[in-house]
């Protein structure tokens, strides 16, 4: 299962959904541009 937009995440183990990226400075899934 992947982490959805706005969900807390770990930038060293990015499990955000496709099209999202874990931001290393705020630790939540944001849009990957």
Swiss-Prot record:
One GO MF term: toxin activity
One Pfam family matching this protein: Toxin_12
Protein's UniProt keywords contain Hydrolase: no
Isoleucine amide sites (modified residues): 33
Name of the protein: Mu-theraphotoxin-Tp1a
Keyword annotations of the record: Amidation, Disulfide bond, Ion channel impairing toxin, Knottin, Neurotoxin, Secreted, Toxin, Voltage-gated sodium channel impairing toxin
Organism whose genome encodes this protein: Thrixopelma pruriens (Peruvian green velvet tarantula)
Additional facts recorded: Negative results: does not affect human voltage-gated calcium channels (Cav) or nicotinic acetylcholine receptors (nAChR) at 5 uM.
Its job: Inhibits voltage-gated sodium channels without significantly altering the voltage dependence of activation or inactivation. Preferentially inhibits human Nav1.7/SCN9A (IC(50)=2.1 nM) > human Nav1.6/SCN8A > human Nav1.2/SCN2A > human Nav1.1/SCN1A > human Nav1.3/SCN3A channels. Exhibits analgesic properties by reversing spontaneous pain induced in mice by intraplantar injection with OD1 (AC P84646), a scorpion toxin that potentiates human Nav1.7/SCN9A.
Lineage: Eukaryota, Metazoa, Ecdysozoa, Arthropoda, Chelicerata
Tissue expr: Expressed by the venom gland.
């Amino acid at each position: 299962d992947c982490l959805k937009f706005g969900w807390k995440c770990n930038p060293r183990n990015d499990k955000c959904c496709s099209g999202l990226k874990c931001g290393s400075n705020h630790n939540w899934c944001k849009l990957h541009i």
